[in-house]
A protein has these predicted regions:
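Conserved GNAT acetyl-CoA-binding A-motif
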Residues: 90-101, 124
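Methionine-biased hydrophobic packing positions in alpha-helices, especially
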Residues: 1, 98-100, 136-138
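Residue-level recognition of the GNAT/N-acetyltransferase active site
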Residues: 2, 70, 74, 103-105, ...
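Conserved catalytic-core motifs of GNAT/GCN5-like acyltransferases
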Residues: 101, 114, 119-136, 148-149, ...
Length: 198
């Protein structure tokens, strides 16, 4: 994600999150945060952005801060592939765990995360400012644990069965290189803000 993506991001954000959504300035601030890692999903034909996600790296924890898909692309596994992208980059920058908060009413998102081995650690009461809704706190086991990797790879195999590409978050297991240190980023750097075609 870059500053140039924000016009398209701001078309999706209020539709995805309603009145309690990030502002354009919030995204701009996040792109200047060296601990922030943000990515977009775009159409391979015309480059149109239809989803995005990202996380903060805090020590060994990748804290997912956003994941959104344009309504026209829902129920097409776009959110699932964005989550796989986050797991891939969390691994690359040295995270051992992943966590997030999700509204207790957002059962669709909860099902996605639970499908990928996230577990509920409890609730944050009155977490959301717009309506004082509680947030469910979700957390993974160590993402380098063989059982977690096996679960993720099973989900990738299921996507491949329906002819969808999905990135393997753990290429080092197959002899590929991986970066284990956090990468320095600038908001305008295309190299540090890749666009994922899903």
């Amino acid at each position: 994600m870059t500053l140039a993506d924000l016009d398209e991001i701001m078309e999706i954000e209020p539709v995805a999150f309603g009145s309690h959504h990030w502002s354009r300035q919030s995204f701009a601030n996040e792109l200047g945060n060296l601990g922030g890692h943000y990515y977009v999903a775009c159409e391979p034909t015309d480059g149109r952005i239809y989803g995005y996600s990202g996380f903060w790296l805090i020590g060994e924890e990748a804290h997912i801060t956003t994941l959104a898909v344009h309504p026209d692309y829902r129920r097409m596994h776009a959110g699932e592939r964005l989550l796989l992208n986050d797991i891939y980059y969390a691994n690359r920058v040295g995270a051992n765990w992943m966590t997030l908060e999700v509204r207790v009413s957002n059962e669709t998102a909860q099902k996605l995360y639970l499908k990928y081995g996230f577990k509920s650690l409890g609730l944050r009461r009155n977490y959301y400012q717009d309506n004082s809704e509680d947030a469910m706190v979700l957390w993974t086991e160590n993402i380098h644990d063989p059982d977690f990797k096996a679960l993720v790879r099973q989900r990738i195999a299921e996507l491949k069965e329906i002819h969808l590409f999905a990135i393997d978050p753990f290429p080092e297991d197959k002899g590929g290189a991986t970066t284990r240190a956090a990468e320095s980023k600038s908001p305008e750097s295309a190299e540090s803000s890749p666009q994922m075609e899903v």
